Amino acid sequence: MQSLHGNCLIAYARHKYILTMVNGEYRYFNGGDLVFADASQIRVDKCVENFVFVSRDTLSLFLPMLKEEALNLHAHKKVSSLLVHHCSRDIPVFQEVAQLSQNKNLRYAEMLRKRALIFALLSVFLEDEHFIPLLLNVLQPNMRTRVCTVINNNIAHEWTLARIASELLMSPSLLKKKLREEETSYSQLLTECRMQRALQLIVIHGFSIKRVAVSCGYHSVSYFIYVFRNYYGMTPTEYQERSAQRLSNRDSAASIVAQGNFYGTDRSAEGIRL
């Protein structure tokens, strides 16, 4: 028997299928049923290929993608330990996710693909009103995660401790206390979220420094540059230049390798002709 606290599982029934709960109860499913469940409440003793276990880390990455209203649901709310969504068509990606999940030595690209496919499977349940309460019951996100989720949903907003507390349905003093217990503060998390978003906008999207500053909630470009330098140890412009240089070096290296492969193939061909 396998029981994983703080994790979830997704099961897919291609034919009639029976799940055994830890309390001994049997749950019956028809072919095409996709199941999302608290892994700690399921006995898994056979047909593991029908399951995809979703770790706490993966769930924590999925949670910030949701709207902050989701966090206003009380995690202690009593909900079912599993949900069922009937799919009218086969889910071809499920088998791929299951295979990737059983491989302990995934390449980086495979890890990213597995995560993306798991997110796609989780999204099937988003319209179920019990999905988010169940997710929160299982994950029980810490206050850092909940605050960052609120901030990231509107990164440019003029966030204050009181405003964030209001979004989380608690008093500012209680929020401050809970963050202190996790050895952080709302201002520290606000800076972390904005700096991480700034890096994405600079490196991936190539925004101008002024546009990045405004997009991240800074009215003063000079102050944004000051915060960025304190956080990353260099100015945004310096970071842009270094990123461009690294990209250029990688392109050059790739070009050299490609040329080497070409000439190597050409010489081999000449050798054959001789």
Curated annotation (Swiss-Prot):
Entry's induction text: Expression can be activated by RpoS and repressed by CRP, H-NS and GadW, depending on the conditions.
Family annotation (SMART domains): HTH_ARAC
A Pfam family recorded for this sequence: HTH_18
Domain HTH araC/xylS-type span(s) in chain numbering: 145-242
Biological process, per Gene Ontology: DNA damage response; DNA-templated transcription; positive regulation of DNA-templated transcription
Keyword presence, Repressor: yes
Annotation: DNA-binding region: 162-183, 209-232
PROSITE patterns: HTH_ARAC_FAMILY_1 (PS00041), HTH_ARAC_FAMILY_2 (PS01124)
Molecular-function annotations in GO: cis-regulatory region sequence-specific DNA binding; DNA-binding transcription activator activity; DNA-binding transcription factor activity; protein homodimerization activity; transcription cis-regulatory region binding
InterPro entries: Homeodomain-like_sf, HTH_AraC, HTH_AraC-typ_CS, Tscrpt_reg_AraC-type_HTH
Keyword annotations: Activator, DNA-binding, Repressor, Transcription, Transcription regulation
Record's miscellaneous remark: GadX and GadW are part of a complex system required for acid resistance via the regulation of gadA and gadBC. Many of the described circuits use mutants missing one of the network components. In the wild-type situation, however, many of the scenarios are not easily observed.
Quaternary structure (record): Homodimer.
Purpose of the protein: Positively regulates the expression of about fifteen genes involved in acid resistance such as gadA, gadB and gadC. Depending on the conditions (growth phase and medium), can repress gadW.
Protein name per Swiss-Prot or TrEMBL: HTH-type transcriptional regulator GadX
Originating species: Escherichia coli (strain K12)
